[in-house]
Amino acid sequence: MVTGTDERLERFRAEFLPKLVTAFRPTVVMAFGSRIRGEGLAHSDLDLVIVSDSFRNIRWLDRPGCVIEALGLKFGVDLFCYTPEEYARKREEFGVVRTACQEGVPLITEPST
């Protein structure tokens, strides 16, 4: 189990979040899942919800790969990438986004400027 401050989350914040902001200008980035609950193992991935207008013209299934490639991520992540409209709908449904909103740690919660 990962204890204390999660190294993967802190590495993402320091190294990759600035790149994400530059490349995709997200309005919401939320970390959630086993690492955030303190239940993650050393090999557990980092679960992230990312909301950006930049995803509008990218197929839903292609979005995570685009983010991983643009940021040069070298460790396990599970990315859920939505447009603002998709995110607004998903927040009201039972599922990943609702869970992330309930238990997640916001990394970005307002529009990027």
Region spans (language model):
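Catalytic core of pol beta-like nucleotidyltransferases
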Residues: 1-28, 36-43, 52-113
